[in-house]
A protein has these predicted regions:
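A Rossmann-like FAD-binding core segment of flavoenzymes
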Residues: 1-12, 16, 23, 91-189
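Hydrophobic beta-strand scaffold positions of dinucleotide-using enzymes
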Residues: 29, 160, 172, 391-393
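Glycine-rich dinucleotide-binding loop and its adjacent helix/turn
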Residues: 30-92, 181-182, 187-189, 409-419
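FAD-site-proximal beta/loop scaffold in flavoenzymes
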Residues: 45-69, 143-147, 151-233, 325, ...
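Rossmann-like dinucleotide-binding cores of NAD(P)H-dependent redox enzymes
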Residues: 72-73, 80-138, 220-224, 240-266
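Mid-to-C-terminal Rossmann-like scaffold of FAD/NAD(P)H-dependent oxidoreductases
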Residues: 204-317, 351-352, 356-385, 389
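A short, polar/charged loop-to-alpha-helix boundary motif
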Residues: 317-336
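Positively charged, proline/Ser/Thr-rich regional signature most characteristic
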Residues: 379-424
Length: 424
């Protein structure tokens, strides 16, 4: 419950007996983790409102679901936990509404990639309310009401709060240790705090994002485990250092796998990085072999240096393999064009002779050599303002009906010659 830096002791409270005592240390490792954000909203103390962070929290939610047999639930927050919670509740036959303050789910993705996740979750029956803020909760005899500003309140049987976490750094702060980004515990590359005899690792420790070079909070299990090893090594006199994290992550969302590494467009733009992007939609393995599915890959790289900044992949099969290859390439200093030379395993059930990662490298090389000039969806807005531009969609009528950009005229490619007069 407390650290006495001068005496090099910690105060310990036994949870079973409430007894307290002091324990001395030579070296101390802090791994307090993170705590869920609980906003000060009306109705937060309702027994129908749950937060999810620990294993014990899952037991409480599962017990409540088993006992109360809820038919409806509201999930507040569209990060990892919120999306996973929505899927698991839906698997129990519960109708789920997911409310997210931002205009998209999963902030590690760019909006175009997140839209693929939105469409898939909607197809699974999840109602998404994006760009909406929760104002509070009210208990009713028929359940709990979630108030969303001026919007219609939502009546449900339970509410799951998963709006993010904060580093649990109060113990460190009370001991006078220096804090860093978002009140995380500041550490060096040996995981030492401002007191060299005290180390900090995990979700409460400030680290360097290896793709951006900026200080960051990365609440992922992989980095936390590596930090623990670095701290233990340093205590034992082994001179290893932590190299930072690219925040590589992977997430199951119903039938999709969503993965990312490095930074996204939003972060690159905010940092003033001059970047290029590639979007491709290859098949997970050889197209002539049954069972292949399309994945969408987005690769960001620095325009001048060709340094890979990050990648995002959404698909059904083979997504984790490709994101790991790109994450490894980033750490090894391989450039975007260098992806074309990677010698990756191939057999028709697993990949294609030109692996999707190789294809991204080919595209980067084509851009660098001036063989291709890219045109992105967001560039359409500028074209709409030009009088001499006709926006033409040459897909089939069925493809056009499934979805099209506003302002595009549909003339199928096979009919284009006979209908040229319509373009005057």
């Amino acid at each position: 419950t407390a650290i006495n830096v001068g005496k090099k002791t910690v105060t310990v409270r036994e949870l079973d007996t409430d007894k307290t005592y002091e324990e001395s240390y030579d070296k101390l490792i802090l791994s307090p983790g993170a705590k869920p954000i609980r906003p000060r909203l009306p109705g937060m103390d309702s027994p129908h409102v749950f937060t999810l962070r620990t294993v014990e929290d899952t037991f409480r939610i599962h017990e409540a679901a088993s006992r109360q047999k809820p038919k409806t639930a509201v999930v507040v927050g569209g990060g990892f936990i919120g999306v996973e919670m929505a899927e698991n509740l839906a698997a129990l036959g519960i109708a789920v509404t997911l409310v997210e303050k931002q205009t998209q789910l999963l902030s590690q993705l760019d909006a175009d990639m997140a839209s693929l996740v939105h469409a898939h979750m909607k197809s699974k029956g999840i109602q998404l309310l994006l760009g909406k803020s929760v104002a509070g909760f009210e208990d009713k005899t028929s359940g709990i009401v979630t108030n969303i500003g001026a919007d219609e309140p939502i009546l449900s049987d339970m509410v799951i709060l998963s709006i993010g976490v904060l580093p649990d750094s109060s113990l460190a702060a009370d001991a006078g240790l220096a804090l860093g980004f978002k009140n995380s515990i500041a550490v060096n590359d040996c995981m030492q705090t401002s007191n060299p005899d005290i180390y900090a690792v995990g979700d409460a420790a400030e680290i360097t994002h290896s793709a951006s070079g900026q200080k960051a909070l990365i609440s992922l299990a992989g980095p936390a485990n590596k930090q623990g090893r670095i701290a233990a090594d340093h205590i034992c006199g082994v001179a290893h250092t932590y190299k930072g994290s690219a925040a590589s992550s992977v997430l199951k969302v119903f039938d999709l796998t969503v993965a990312s590494t490095g930074i996204n467009e939003r972060t690159a733009g905010a940092a003033g990085v001059d970047y290029e992007k590639i979007v491709l939609s290859p098949v997970s393995h050889a197209s002539y072999y049954p069972g292949g599915t399309v994945m969408t890959i987005k690769l960001l790289f620095e325009r001048e240096s060709d340094r890979i900044l990050g990648a995002q992949i959404v698909g059904s099969d083979g997504v984790d393999k490709r994101i790991d290859v790109i994450a490894t390439a980033m750490q090894a200093g391989i450039t975007a064009i260098g992806l074309k030379d990677l010698d990756l395993a191939y057999a028709p059930p697993y990949s294609s002779a030109k692996d999707p990662v190789n294809m991204a490298g080919f595209m980067a090389e084509n851009i660098a050599d001036g063989l291709v000039k890219q045109f992105h969806y967001e560039d359409i807005a500028d074209l709409r303002c030009r009088e001499n531009v006709i926006l033409l969609d040459t897909r089939t009528p069925a493809e056009y009906a499934r979805g099209h950009a506003e302002g595009f005229r549909n003339i199928p490619l096979d009919d284009l010659r006979e209908r040229l007069a319509e373009l005057d």
